[in-house]
A protein has these predicted regions:
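Bacterial N-terminal signal peptides that target proteins for export
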Residues: 1-12
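Bacterial N-terminal signal peptides
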Residues: 11-21
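Sec-dependent signal peptide cleavage junction
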Residues: 19-29
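Structured soluble/peripheral alpha/beta segments that form catalytic or ligand/cofactor-binding pockets
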Residues: 30-374
């Protein structure tokens, strides 16, 4: 009787596994999917459960952090591009200081325009939100720098007025979101640091953009047919020195579908979750580990030769042909950043969970290497 029961149970488990494999040919048991609301930190300030989700299940509370307050870093970073022009908005509180920055650059000519508003010893006073997707309003109005960011269930809007040098600098932009817009949410520890160090991040891709940016006599229009926004929403307790790789892109395919990707490594211990995700018409598809071929050559300064990416599951096979390196080199006392954000045209294939292969042709996207001391 017991042997028969075991055989039946074994057969049922086999059928379940076969059915699951047929329905979802790409599943990743090694990455931990968070399926219910979970406090991000425990009573000791350590991560409760490292993992990922596509709709945020983590509950972030800055007051629950027990680490050295100078190590707390929070930011909202919006990047909008139409293939030629790119505008970036950063709201950051790295505890020792805070900043709101706006930068517009032309990837054909290299011309750029910047405005910024700085504060010292902020330690959370920038007032950044505890959740990326809930309706909210952030504003900063200080000495001719006026920034408003509004979030609703269906869109985000950014309104800015300031100066790039002596030239008036204005932006009015609206980013649309899909119903139940899925994103990549990840919480991982830094195993080479104190257990209270962690990285909590959400990437919201594939938001079509409508709007106008003006600087002096220059007018740049962003149209939803070819203009997209990514939000990089980050909260965490970081080591002083960290080096990472991050790639991201969105585009509209010939059939009108909206497709994008998020890849990255170097952000702590990613054994429970990686950033690597494909987005297709508002839905997220988790993929395996990504390798950048000849990564060491890039670090040696070979930034403008082709970048070849491959994944261990074959679901992300892409080549970027660079055309612009958005270089940042900054150091103020003991805080510094060197970043090569390389934009290019991406070609290759991305595979969805159901096995559908999406062919990518000349998607304008980027991958960066960033070395931070903060």
């Amino acid at each position: 009787m017991k042997k028969s029961a075991v055989r039946i149970l074994s057969l049922l488990l086999t059928l379940v596994m076969l059915f699951s494999s047929a329905a979802l040919p790409y599943a990743f048991a090694e990455q931990v999917l968070i399926t219910e609301k979970t406090p991000l930190l425990d009573e000791n300030g350590a991560l409760t459960k490292p993992g990922y989700c596509f709709n945020n299940m983590y509950e972030y509370d800055r007051s629950a952090i027990k680490a050295n307050p100078t190590r707390i870093k929070e930011w909202d970073f919006y990047q909008i591009s139409n293939g030629r022009y790119c505008i970036q908005f950063t709201i950051a509180d790295i505890s020792l200081g805070g900043a709101c920055t706006v930068g517009l650059f032309d990837m054909q000519t290299g011309k750029r325009y910047d405005a910024l508003s700085l504060s010292l010893l902020t330690f959370g006073r920038m007032g950044l939100n505890s959740d990326a997707m809930t309706p909210q309003h952030y504003s900063r109005h200080l000495f001719g720098f006026d920034l408003d960011v509004r979030v609703t269930d269906t869109k985000r809007t950014i309104s800015f007025s300031g100066y790039a040098g002596l030239e008036p600098f204005k932006a009015e932009l609206s980013m649309e979101m899909f119903p139940n817009h899925e994103s990549l949410v990840m919480a991982v520890p830094f195993t080479d640091a104190d257990e209270q160090h962690f990285y909590f991040n959400q990437k919201v891709n594939c938001m079509p953009v409508t709007g106008i940016v003006t600087v002096g006599d220059l007018t740049v229009e962003f149209d939803p047919s070819d203009s997209f926004c990514v939000l990089d929403w980050g909260r965490g307790v970081w080591p002083y020195h960290e080096n990472w790789w991050w790639g991201n892109g969105s585009s509209r395919l010939e059939d009108g579908s909206i497709c994008g990707f998020e890849i990255g490594w170097g952000f702590g211990d990613m054994s429970a979750a990686t950033e690597n995700t494909v987005f297709y018409n508002g839905k997220a598809h988790k993929i395996g580990n990504i390798t950048l071929v000849d990564q060491d050559k890039k670090l040696a300064g070979d930034w403008m030769s082709p970048w070849v990416f491959t994944s261990d599951d074959g679901r992300f096979e892409m080549t970027m042909t660079p055309f612009y390196d958005n270089i940042t080199q900054m150091r103020v006392l003991f805080i510094g950043n060197i970043c090569h954000q390389v934009f290019g045209k991406w070609n290759g294939t991305m595979t969805l969970d159901d096995g559908t292969v999406v062919e990518i042709k000349d998607m304008v996207a980027f991958c960066e290497n960033s070395d931070n001391m903060w």
